[in-house]
Regions:
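Short acidic/polar hinge/loop motifs at secondary-structure boundaries
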Residues: 108-135
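Short sequence motifs at beta-strands and strand-loop junctions characteristic
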Residues: 83-85, 143, 173-177, 225-234, ...
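Structural signature of outer-membrane beta-barrel domains
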Residues: 42, 98, 110, 156, ...
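N-terminal periplasmic "start-of-domain" segments of outer-membrane beta-barrel proteins
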Residues: 33-62
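Outer-envelope beta-barrel architecture signal
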Residues: 101, 162-166, 179, 190-194, ...
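Transmembrane beta-barrel strands of outer-membrane/channel proteins
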Residues: 168-174, 181, 187, 196-202, ...
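N-terminal periplasmic accessory domains that precede
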Residues: 69-72, 87-92, 104, 118-121, ...
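Flexible loop and strand-edge segments within Gram-negative outer membrane beta-barrel domains
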Residues: 22, 228-234, 247-272
Length: 272
């Protein structure tokens, strides 16, 4: 009786062992491709704010580029452009502009666009790589001017690799014969990043499909279907340097923005 009990136990043990061996032989190994997780301090800080924040990078800016930064951003919901001629434009966020919003370029607030309706942004539209727009009260972060929001132009970030890069861009418009272009050259080596850009635009008087217009209840003739004194040109030069190593960071930007353009007669006062 005891012998049968022992033999039955041994038989069950060998059966279980053989079944486990068959199951282990049928398991297949699968190699998964690597998963790369990237992040930055800038994006982490953006998630902490309760304001409506939108970030627009180079691909969006190129797709909607018009030669004027504010006109490029006017497709953003809540952002509007107050255009004065072909070159000057002032931004508005949710109906407010002038000294009710702040415009920052590389950490420096633009002051010129606040004074009057005929003062636009002194910024080269070709020289913008990334724009961050905050909609809502931001006075604690950017000063008392940022009651309605902020348009912040962010500096170019290094790729942390030794490289030589460049860019050439052309712009043309038929409505006023605009011809423009920009050339950029840059080098990144070790902890240094240096970039130089030159941009220039020329444009003539606006073409309109009418021979007369009504301005302040007066009938004004349009000779040759062109709005006289709306031509102009602009020439911009900028140099940017960036140094980053461990806990040290330095950014230097020098720019010269020159704009000369006319205003349509009657833009200020009664037409002659």
């Amino acid at each position: 009786m005891r012998i049968r009990y022992v033999s039955g136990t041994l038989g069950m043990f060998f059966t279980l062992f053989s079944n486990a061996q068959v199951v282990s032989d049928t398991i297949k190994s699968v190699d998964l491709s690597e998963v790369v997780v990237t992040g930055s301090y800038r994006h982490a800080q953006e998630k902490k704010t309760t304001l409506t924040l939108e970030l627009f990078q180079k691909d969006y800016l190129n797709r909607h580029f018009t030669g004027n930064l504010v006109q490029t951003l006017k497709n953003v919901p809540g952002v509007h452009s107050m255009d004065i001629g072909a070159g000057f434009s002032k931004p508005m966020i949710r109906g407010l502009g002038f000294n009710r919003i702040a415009v920052s370029e590389n950490g420096i607030k633009q002051e010129g666009q606040q004074w009057g309706a005929d003062h636009g942004l002194e910024i080269d539209a070709f020289n913008v790589d990334e724009v961050r727009i905050l909609k809502g009260p931001s006075s604690l972060l950017y000063g008392s001017d940022a009651m309605r929001g902020v348009i912040e132009i962010l500096p170019l970030l290094p790729q942390k690799e030794n490289r030589f890069f460049g860019e050439a861009a052309l712009l043309g418009k038929s409505v006023n014969g605009t011809v423009g272009g920009s050339l950029m050259l840059g080098i990144e080596k070790n902890a240094w990043l240096v970039r130089v850009r030159f941009s220039e635009q020329h444009y003539g008087d606006y073409h309109v499909p009418v021979d007369t217009i009504v301005y302040l209840t007066q009938l004004v003739p349009v000779y040759g279907r062109k709005l006289k004194n709306t031509a102009g040109f602009e020439r911009n030069v900028s140099v940017m340097g960036d140094y980053r190593k461990r806990f040290y960071q330095m950014n230097i930007a020098v720019s010269n923005v020159y704009q000369k353009m006319g205003f349509f007669p009657g833009a200020h006062g009664i037409h002659d």
